[in-house]
From Swiss-Prot:
Tissue specificity annotation: Expressed in both guard cells and mesophyll cells.
EC class name: transferase
Residues engaged in binding Ca(2+) 1: 392, 394, 396, 403
Key words, A-Z: ATP-binding, Calcium, Cytoplasm, Kinase, Lipoprotein, Metal-binding, Myristate, Nucleotide-binding, Nucleus, Phosphoprotein, Repeat, Serine/threonine-protein kinase, Transferase
Protein name: Calcium-dependent protein kinase 3
Region (Disordered): 1-73
Gene3D superfamilies linked to this entry: EF-hand (1.10.238.10), Phosphorylase Kinase, domain 1 (3.30.200.20), Transferase(Phosphotransferase) domain 1 (1.10.510.10)
The species this protein was found in: Arabidopsis thaliana
Residues bound to Ca(2+) 4: 499, 501, 503, 505, 510
Lineage of producing organism: Eukaryota, Viridiplantae, Streptophyta, Embryophyta, Tracheophyta
UniProt free text on domains: There are 3 contiguous domains conserved in the CDPK subfamily: a kinase domain, an autoinhibitory (junction) domain and a calmodulin-like domain. The autoinhibitory domain (342-372) inactivates kinase activity under calcium-free conditions.
Domain of life: Eukaryota
């Protein structure tokens, strides 16, 4: 998921004078009614200055339609380098200031993708909120916002220390105390946001990066694209967030800032066990598990973990948001405090193994689904093919979000805007903001087709180029390059996690198990000696 679903209420942003810190999902359907909280250029236009050197503008310059202030070419000030990451709307690049030579990150959002009024308001609000929260040790610093004829460019502090899970896995040794330290930094972000009238709404491990590779580097929250301003008592109805981390009240469309605590609690559960607390074969299954809300502390490694760790997880994942701890109460919990009771005894290696698998598995599965889609018979996909043709109104072979939004209701579909966003997010494998024919078929074909033996064997044969009966690292690398879906590190991780007999290759049995199973416990349990 990791996307937006609808804003029924967004409170007005606090006045700009309150910008000092006091210490402290799913998709985006938005109703046609009045939206508050991101009215236009006021905050955005006045607060986005570039780093190093002045930005001169004249009154004759044309105002950009997104930020509502004079347009400027970001490339006049910054030299663009390699791509750092890719999201639903934009691409993040490493850029260098031409005068100061300072390296920063630039999130570049093509304005052609911001066709819907609410998408434009989301970008404006992201800029407002990042300026509003600037200066906090654990929040990435927004240094400036530029708009030219083609894109909005957000210049941000460069985080070179890698993602949360990457750091944990690369260190090898890991303890409750390390998990407590990471969780404390995340909850400090939540506390700061809430005390300044901001709800994050998309807390997940991928949205936290380390500033540097230094051992004591701070952890930084990096993505505020779904965040909103709120006032005490405000309730929101839009379905936003990311599947594993979304709170039950968000799924029920009646929630407040307590939903951020739930998401942080899910991350803590993963930090301690390597797997999410609520699991399903697909998004619907995950949501069903969340709505049931049954926490299980009987499986490994929970019996070996401290009572304090389990107590905090329980209190952050209370089903009723009124019973959940606040961010301030979490920070005062004896287990998480800096001088607290969390043990520095290393956790079982199986925790790291499960964490690696949770991170790596989806990439190979998505590629295999695309291969299956390529090889389905005309009879099997005739209905889906006709649906794609009717959605692709300009006959260019791709379906945009706007084409989905306007086309699905015409097909008699009762699909909600939230589900349309979900379909786009799930289907758009290469992250270009549109769905091609194969991506569409891959995302919409029924699960029973995936589990048919002939389809699985066809997919396996696609990867196994030399018909040796194994998928090697070289063969996986070729496939991932074809679909633009990963780097050398991802390839090694996939081999390591799917290859249960540890011979450096993936055999057919291992491939089928990976495709059919959603339970991340299965492989690590087989690995135990």
């Amino acid at each position: 998921m990791g996307h937006r679903h609808s804003k029924s209420k967004s409170s007005d942003p606090p006045p700009s004078s309150s910008s000092s810190s006091s210490g402290n999902v799913v998709h985006h359907v938005k109703p046609a009614g009045e939206r508050r909280g991101s009215s236009g250029s006021g905050t955005v236009g006045s607060s986005g200055s570039g780093t190093g050197g002045s930005r001169s503008t004249t009154s004759t310059q044309q105002n950009g339609r997104i930020l509502g202030r004079p347009m400027e070419e970001v490339r006049r000030t910054y030299e663009f380098g390699r791509e750092l990451g890719r999201g639903q709307f934009g691409v993040t690049y490493l850029v260098t200031h031409k005068e100061t030579k300072q390296q920063v990150a630039c999130k570049s959002i093509p304005t052609r993708r911001l066709v819907h009024k609410d998408d434009i308001e989301d970008v404006r609000r992201e800029v407002q909120i990042m300026h509003h929260l600037s200066g906090h040790r654990n929040i990435v610093d927004l240094k400036g916002a530029y708009e030219d004829r083609h894109s909005v460019n957000l210049i941000m502090e460069l985080c070179e220390g890698g993602e949360l899970f990457d750091r944990i896995i690369s260190k090898g040794l890991y303890s409750e105390r390390a998990a407590a330290d990471l969780c404390r930094q995340m909850v400090m972000v939540v506390h700061s946001c809430h005390s300044m009238g901001v709800m994050h709404r998309d807390l997940k491990p991928e949205n936290f990066l380390f500033l540097s590779k230094d051992e004591n580097s701070p952890l930084k929250a990096t993505d505020f694209g779904l965040s909103v301003f709120f006032k005490p008592g405000d309730k929101f109805k839009d379905l936003v967030g990311s599947a594993y981390y979304v709170a039950p009240e968000v799924l029920k469309r009646n929630y407040g800032p307590e939903a951020d605590i739930w998401s942080a609690g899910v991350i803590l559960y993963i930090l301690l066990s390597g797997v999410p607390p609520f699991w399903g074969e697909n998004e619907t299954g995950i949501f069903d598990a969340i709505l049931q809300g049954q926490l299980d502390f009987s499986a490994d490694p929970w019996p070996a973990l401290s009572d304090g760790a389990k107590d905090l997880v329980r209190k952050m994942l209370k089903y009723d948001p009124k019973d959940r701890l606040t961010a301030a109460e979490v920070l005062n919990h004896p287990w998480i405090r800096e001088d607290g009771e969390a043990s520095d005894k290393p956790l079982d290696n199986a925790v790291l193994s499960r964490m690696k698998q949770f991170r790596a598995m989806n990439k190979l599965k998505k590629m295999a689904l695309k291969v299956i889609a390529e090889n389905l018979s005309e009879e099997e996909i005739i209905g889906l093919k006709e649906m794609f043709k009717s959605l692709d109104t300009d006959n260019n072979g791709i379906v945009t979000l706007e084409e989905l939004r306007t086309g699905l209701p015409k097909l008699g579909s009762k699909i909600s805007e939230a589900e349309i966003r979900q379909l786009m997010e799930a289907a758009d494998m290469d992250g270009d903001g549109s769905i091609d024919y194969l991506e569409f078929i891959s995302a919409t074909m029924h699960m029973n087709r995936i589990e048919r033996e002939d389809h699985l064997y066809t997919a396996f044969q696609f990867f196994d180029n030399d018909n040796s009966g194994y998928i090697t690292m070289e063969e996986l690398e070729l496939a991932m390059k074809k679909y633009n879906m990963g780097d050398d590190k991802s390839i090694k991780e996939i081999i390591a996690e799917v290859d249960t007999d540890r011979d450096g290759k993936i055999n057919y049995e291992e491939f089928v198990a990976m495709m059919k199973k959603g339970n991340p416990e299965l492989v690590p349990n087989r690995r135990r000696m």
